[in-house]
Amino acid sequence: MEKKHGLAALLLLFLLVACGPSGNYGYPLKIGFGREGGTKICSGKEGFYDVSINDYNGNGETKLSKGENDTIIATCYWLTVKYKGPFNNEMKIIAEPNTTGKKRTLYVYCMVDNSGATIKVTQSK
């Protein structure tokens, strides 16, 4: 009888996990860079179709441009995001070297399924 209760509890746990939210659509919640900057590739479970970069208060103008091979480039302050066309699930995040002497933070917002995924990007001083 005790095994049945344990099995039922385990099954209930699996059902609750399966019905939960998609957890930022598989994209990382946070990415960190050292003061030297660099490049990181991140991906999610579902494709996104728009990217913007802002600070915590929503400030910052994302400049969009087109690169080679249909690459879209989004830049705001010290951070650049490159990705291939709409509905891609992979992006390249590039941080410039930090010469400010202060830790800095920006947020990458991706539109996924009429909702959004948010990636907090930090860089050490």
Where do the language-model regions lie?
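Bacterial N-terminal signal peptides that target proteins for export
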Residues: M1-L7
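C-terminal motif of bacterial Sec signal peptides marking the signal peptidase cleavage site
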Residues: L15-A18
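Bacterial signal peptide processing site
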Residues: G20-G23
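Post-signal peptide N-terminal segment of mature Sec-exported envelope proteins
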Residues: P28-E46
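Surface-exposed binding patches on compact interaction domains or structured appendages
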Residues: E46-K92
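Short, hydrophobic beta-strand segments
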Residues: M91-T99
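A short beta-strand micro-motif common to beta-rich folds, especially ectodomain repeats
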Residues: T100-N114
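C-terminal edge beta-strand
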Residues: N114-K125
